[in-house]
Amino acid sequence: MGQRQGKPYRVALLGLYHESNTFIARKTTFEDFQNSHLLRGEEIIAEYRDAYHEIGGMLAVMDREGVEVLPLLFAEATPGGTVTAAAYQRLLNEMTTLLAETLPIDGCLVVPHGAGVSEEQRDMDGHWLGKVRELVGPDVPIVGTIDPHANVSRAMVEATDALIAYRTNPHVDQRDTGRIAGELMIKCLNGTIKPNQCLAKPPVTISIEQQYTAAYPCTLLYEEAAVLMQWPGVLSVSVVLGFPYADVPEMGTSFLVVTDDDRQAGVAVAQRLEALLITHRYAFVGKLETVDAQLAEMYRLEKPILWLDMGDNVGGGSLGDSVVLLKALERDGRLRGFTCIFDPVAVTVLRKYERGAQVKILFGNDYSLGLSHNPYAAEVSVLDKVDGKFRETTPRHGGQVQYDMGETVLVETAAGNVVMIHSLRVPPFSLSQLTSFGLDPAGFDVLIAKGVNAPIAAYGTVCHTIMQANTPGVTQADMTTMEFRVRPKPLFPFEDIST
């Protein structure tokens, strides 16, 4: 049992979770956290105890061991632009105040993303984890999880005893990863292990479309990591793929190894994985296909087709307002498609009309004309007006249960394509986004999802074909076309590292 001197261990639980795309002009505000998940105290337990989320896994272990969990704050916003200084400082102040009021504690479970950037702190996660360490002192174990899209910093590692990355992308093992972190925390509290973390950062970053963990080339790394996990004294081996849309000094792929006080083993394991990635680095550069080439191929493929809009990847920070793929279907006219478009202004206009009304409307943005605002003009029929709330109760990317698109209007274009226009940004991680509002995914030829790999966990259950489209936008697949200022150099594929 999790006890010391006959009393339950006291373990704090807190997290600040954001994947920040520094190429997006629109900043992430405090309101964005409020519109996503800003939970305090028992709200955290109620939301995640039974969820397929890392917090759910942590709680399961703590409950089993009789640990007193002290839930403080969990703040998460949909991936987007850099977090404003005001939003970060407000969240940090609340978090540290709550933690200070809770001391003394025996341990601290933390839930960072690992790719958070604020206006004043490029290494946002390293900064807030460091503040947690300052408060609790050097002897209180800090154990947590990170997203494999983290850009891991030395500061993150130095502030914690153990960080464990999810092993899957799409992320369907978050609850299990939280369980692993919870088990390590119990062992730390009982004094049966003394974690030592080793970080390796090879001069390589992996293209986003090559980060699908169930397929080659990612399987090269994960299969080797599984073998290395069997080494004596190794507690965890994390393959951290990295997030290529954050211009930070820590950008890139990394390997994080946790051992039981065996620094030599940790270094050896990390170096094995580093050498493997460098040797096979060219396999991690994707082959990109144009929209027109994919559209021409669709007629002979089994339907429905999942068409992934990589340039407007909401899970990577994009707005989710691109009409590039919708316009391609509209021009062609032979395939019936579905897509979601974020456009609160269009929603406000459409909400004034009754079901069945024919409306000429401007919505979305045509990124093929550049990054400035170029809305799409169409005549549509209003199908339905809904509140945009839905739930997901199965293991899906992100592990969330409650979703809220805000006020939402379903329309159908003259070409027969159905568009869900919504007022809050929500990534396409759940088929309930369709089924909750009476839409049958199997009734479409093409389902457009604004993502790269993450939507596959949900849409792959109904789509027989998956295609990643090389579309324009702030999450365009070819990161070498983007202007970086502070990323590390040399870094493959930007620079040659053969010498």
Q: Which residues make up each language-model segment?
A:
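Conserved anion/nucleotide-ligand pocket segment
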Residues: 178, 182-226
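Extended hydrophobic packing segments that form well-structured cores
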Residues: 71, 278, 390-499
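Generic secondary-structure signature for well-ordered alpha-helical cores
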Residues: 63-67, 97-104, 134-137, 165-168, ...
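Active-site histidine-anchored catalytic micro-motif
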Residues: 12-19, 23, 33-34, 85-92, ...
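Hard-cation-handling environments
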Residues: 9-11, 209-416, 420, 424
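Low-complexity, highly charged intrinsically disordered N-terminal segments
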Residues: 59-87, 91-98
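N-terminal amphipathic/basic leader segments beginning at the initiator methionine
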Residues: 2-64
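Short acidic, glycine/serine/threonine-rich loops at helix termini
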Residues: 23-27, 81-84, 120-122, 153-158, ...
